[in-house]
């Protein structure tokens, strides 16, 4: 302490508790104070045996004592623990200087608390280490205040006298400390007052505004965070730790011995030395910031500027857990303090620097890695994403995905080497927190968030995020190619030579796409092996027979042969006679009118997309005239009969084609169907409506020209050689859905894949009967002109969900679950279903032969099960249940 301040020492708390037996020692201390020189410690040491063997170093305040003055050292320890800092604070006072407080005001102490504070005289300025604390400037004292360092407090046992004035908690003694302790909860700044000399009023630490009035203890403490008053410093400390989450002291318990503040290596001396915060030892090991070491601005200002350096900190720290935290697993909220509260975070980052013995303990390097996208912290919770990951790892396309990083290190034991890293059992998504067992599944799942679609089709603009989806998409191209293969009348194969540039183009594209897919995912399921022709022919005939037996006759049978003739002609097959130009144009206009009427009668006219397509078709007549080639034979039958236009040029046993422009829309109801008088055909009409509704996507998805050209060829190919009069798609090659469009499972939209020129120029030319003819080139490999495997030959795909079916009838029923269509209706009630078997099962509820029949009294509807009748009454006649007759019947029963 400077000579100017020796006459007016700083105000100290009067809770100085000294036993009477130590009075003679106190006198000896005052006599020896004049010649005692206090040396500035160069570092931290133990309780005994400091850096110099001839010196005694206090383990709490790092004050050195000559070995000959051991009594002074003992009394220094006793007086500090009693709450009086006079022996430590004014060790260099002159003999004539009055003590800071009279002994009559001191109280008796029965158990010591080790607290010390160091003040160095002016003669030892050259030995000073960097500033270790900020002491507020007092009003009535001239000159700056000497910086002092507050020591760490060792935990002590509770007193056996609960009602005595013994301090039983380490931090309760802080009420006796001078107001120079910079803690996060308050700032040490002077408070103006009108006291006499030596009684300057100063704000007390720990977030309290102490009203010092010259007494031994302030009368009230006010928390600067919540403005709650306290009449005791101990209550304020408890409030700060329990309410605001500050780790100030260690609560007594069995684990207290392992959580004592540890001794650290001394800070380096010099102008660039780091200012060590006095708070470092008051925060336990469990504080997350004690495990960090971050470079930041150091307090190198004059101690007098400490008023604005440590502002009052709001409650930004949540109560940390009471166990050792792994610095590698710091949450995003803790790391986010760097950006949100830089000053507070920098202040706390200076707590208790640790010796870096291994690269794993270099936390500053770890933080730089976190900021440099080299590691991904785990998500805060499975239900939400990690905001820190989005801050540090913004998505950007790169050769290596930023998500493919090493997993975080496991928690390390407090005193051991890092354990070997066990294999992670689950992977979690950084966006939604969903966990996966395999990394590959997590990578595919991330693409749903990022929109990345690395797998692209070479035949169209389809792209997907998974190789299996590309494989499924490629099957639709194979179905398109396979659907172009025809079928003869007798169901057997009839070889024909294709036009150059028809199937070869699509075959080459499929080969390239197949090779690209095999590059992405080596899956042998796309390989096609040839099968026996006899087996294929038998299966085709059996399948054809089953379809013919399972489908009812309909009035559209008159169109099947005619449509085949037109589709054959539309393919541009050479040798087909054509009609005259004028007759073809008139016939085209007539067919356009018939098409509009058919769409209105069937119900397609009510849908806006079909109306737009029809209007657009009329505008693009020139394109359709160029697309349709060949002649028209046997097209004079406009009545509703079963007109079989089998005469004309024979292609695969069919009639000839039609002239250009005579078929504006082949395949879509070439002639107006006859009315459906019988109720048995109602279901057939419904089924046709369902399929027609699903054939065309919304017009806004793709260009209308592409819609028309591909829909035209796809639907014509689907109905090319059907023997079943009622849209009998016997396999996937004849389905209008598998040939005209494919479902994109990525965005839920319908896309048309095949370019119009490939199919319109010659896509329908020269196809054989059952596609088993050896002359038809195989698309993507040798063999027949369609996928040779049983699954690929019979499978068909739903356009809505992508589900694959082996039977087209199952696909038709499945589509109704998406569209809500229920064509099968009960004639006795208003029950409707999408499957005939369900209607049959429903009809059993109306009565069976040989069983008792229950009839509804209101509508006379029969039921074979009484519970069904009760349900019917409640659902349809609930308002009639409580009629007078029912009430009378209920009264009789009661």
Swiss-Prot record:
Coiled coil: none annotated. The modification Phosphoserine is found at residues 97, 110, 129, 256, 277, 358, 381, 398, 401, 483, 488, 496-497, 678, 765, 772. Residues 737-752 have a biased composition (Polar residues). Residues 511-529 have a biased composition (Basic and acidic residues). A zinc finger (C2H2-type) spans 221-251, 427-454, 455-482, 796-823, 824-853, 854-884. Changing residue 331 to P: In a colorectal cancer sample; somatic mutation. Key regulator of both differentiation and survival of T-lymphocytes during thymocyte development in mammals. Essential in controlling the responsiveness of hematopoietic stem cells to chemotactic signals by modulating the expression of the receptors CCR7 and CCR9, which direct the movement of progenitor cells from the bone marrow to the thymus. Is a regulator of IL2 promoter and enhances IL2 expression in activated CD4(+) T-lymphocytes. Tumor-suppressor that represses transcription through direct, TFCOUP2-independent binding to a GC-rich response element. Interacts with TFCOUP1, SIRT1, ARP1 and EAR2. Interacts with EP300; the interaction is detected in activated T-lymphocytes, but not under resting conditions. This is B-cell lymphoma/leukemia 11B. It comes from Homo sapiens. The lineage of its organism: Eukaryota, Metazoa, Chordata, Craniata, Vertebrata.
């Amino acid at each position: 302490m400077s000579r100017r301040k020796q006459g007016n020492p700083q105000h100290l708390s009067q809770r100085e508790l000294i036993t009477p037996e130590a009075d003679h020692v106190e006198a000896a201390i005052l006599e020896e104070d004049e010649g005692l020189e206090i040396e500035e410690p160069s570092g931290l040491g133990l309780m005994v045996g400091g850096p110099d063997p001839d010196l005694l170093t206090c383990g709490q305040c790092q004050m050195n004592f000559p070995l000959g003055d051991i009594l002074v050292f003992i009394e220094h320890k006793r007086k500090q623990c009693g709450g009086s800092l006079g022996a430590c604070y004014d060790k260099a006072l002159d003999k004539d200087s009055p003590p800071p407080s009279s002994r009559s005001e001191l109280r008796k102490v029965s158990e010591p608390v080790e607290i010390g504070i160091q003040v160095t005289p002016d003669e030892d300025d050259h030995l000073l280490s960097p500033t270790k604390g900020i002491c507020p400037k007092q009003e009535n004292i001239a000159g700056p205040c000497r910086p002092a360092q507050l020591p760490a407090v060792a935990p002590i046992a509770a007193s056996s006298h609960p009602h005595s004035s013994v301090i039983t908690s380490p931090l309760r003694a802080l009420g006796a400390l001078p107001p120079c302790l910079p803690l996060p909860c308050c700032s040490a700044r002077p408070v103006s007052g009108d006291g006499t000399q030596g009684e300057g009023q100063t704000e007390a630490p720990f977030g309290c505004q102490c009203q010092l009035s010259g007494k031994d203890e302030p009368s009230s403490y006010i928390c600067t965070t919540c403005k709650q008053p306290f009449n005791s410093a101990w209550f304020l400390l408890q409030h700060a730790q329990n309410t605001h989450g500050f780790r100030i002291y260690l609560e007594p318990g069995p684990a207290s011995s392992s959580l004592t503040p540890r001794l650290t290596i001394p800070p380096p001396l010099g102008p660039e030395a780091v200012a060590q915060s006095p708070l470092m030892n008051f925060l336990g090991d469990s504080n997350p910031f004690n495990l960090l070491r971050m470079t930041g601005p150091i307090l190198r200002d004059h101690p007098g500027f400490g008023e604005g350096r440590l502002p009052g900190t709001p409650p930004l720290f949540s109560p940390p857990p009471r166990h050792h935290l792994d610095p590698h697993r710091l949450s995003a909220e803790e790391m986010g303090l760097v950006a949100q509260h830089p000053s507070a975070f920098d202040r706390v980052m200076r707590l208790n620097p640790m010796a870096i013995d291994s690269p794993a303990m270099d936390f500053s390097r770890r933080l730089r890695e976190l900021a440099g996208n080299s590691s991904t912290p785990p998500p805060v919770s499975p239900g939400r994403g990690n905001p820190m990951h989005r801050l540090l790892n913004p998505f950007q396309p790169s050769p290596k995905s930023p998500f493919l990083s090493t997993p975080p290190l496991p928690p390390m034991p407090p005193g051991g080497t890092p354990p070997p890293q066990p294999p992670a059992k689950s992977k979690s998504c950084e966006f939604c927190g969903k966990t996966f067992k395999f990394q590959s599944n997590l990578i595919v799942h991330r693409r749903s968030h990022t929109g990345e679609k690395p797998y692209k089709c070479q035949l169209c603009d389809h792209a997907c995020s998974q190789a299996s989806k590309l494989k499924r998409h490629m099957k639709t191209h194979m179905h398109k190619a396979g659907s172009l293969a025809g079928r003869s009348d007798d169901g057997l194969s009839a070889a024909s030579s294709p036009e150059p540039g028809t199937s070869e183009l699509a075959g080459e594209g499929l080969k390239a796409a197949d090779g690209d897919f095999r590059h992405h995912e080596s899956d042998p399921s796309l390989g096609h092996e040839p099968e026996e022709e006899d087996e294929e022919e038998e299966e085709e005939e059996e399948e054809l027979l089953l379809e013919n037996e399972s489908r009812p006759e309909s009035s559209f049978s008159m169109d099947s042969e005619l449509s085949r003739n037109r589709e054959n002609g539309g393919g541009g097959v050479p040798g087909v006679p054509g009609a005259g130009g004028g007759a073809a144009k008139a016939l085209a206009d007539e067919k356009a009118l018939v098409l509009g009427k058919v769409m209105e009668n069937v119900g397609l006219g009510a849908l806006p997309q079909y109306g737009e397509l029809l209007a657009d078709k009329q505008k693009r007549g020139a394109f359709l005239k160029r697309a349709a080639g060949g002649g028209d034979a046997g097209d004079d039958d406009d009545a509703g009969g079963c007109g079989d236009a089998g005469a004309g040029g024979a292609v695969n046993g069919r009639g000839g084609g039609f002239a250009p422009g005579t078929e504006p829309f082949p395949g879509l109801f070439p002639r107006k169907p006859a009315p459906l008088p019988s109720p048995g055909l109602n279901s057939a009409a419904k089924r046709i409506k369902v399929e027609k509704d699903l054939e065309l996507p919304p017009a806004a998805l793709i260009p209308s020209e592409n819609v028309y050209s591909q829909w035209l060829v796809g639907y014509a190919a689907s109905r090319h050689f059907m023997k079943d009069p009622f849209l009998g798609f016997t396999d996937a090659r004849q389905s209008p859905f598998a040939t005209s469009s494919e479902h994109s499972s990525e965005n839920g939209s319908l896309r048309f894949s095949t370019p119009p020129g490939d199919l319109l120029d010659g896509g329908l030319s020269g196809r054989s009967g059952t596609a088993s003819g050896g002359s038809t080139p195989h698309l993507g490999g040798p063999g027949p002109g369609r996928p040779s495997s049983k699954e690929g030959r019979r499978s068909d795909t739903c356009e809505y969900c992508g589900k694959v079916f082996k039977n087209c009838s199952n696909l038709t029923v499945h589509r109704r679950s998406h569209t809500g269509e229920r064509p099968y209706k009960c004639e006795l009630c208003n029950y409707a279903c999408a499957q005939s078997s369900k209607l049959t099962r429903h009809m059993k509820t109306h009565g069976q032969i040989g069983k008792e029949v229950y009839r509804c009294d209101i509508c006379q509807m029969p039921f074979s099960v009484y519970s069904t009748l009760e349900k019917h009454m409640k659902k349809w006649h609930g308002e009639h249940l409580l009629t007078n007759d029912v009430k009378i019947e209920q009264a009789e029963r009661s």
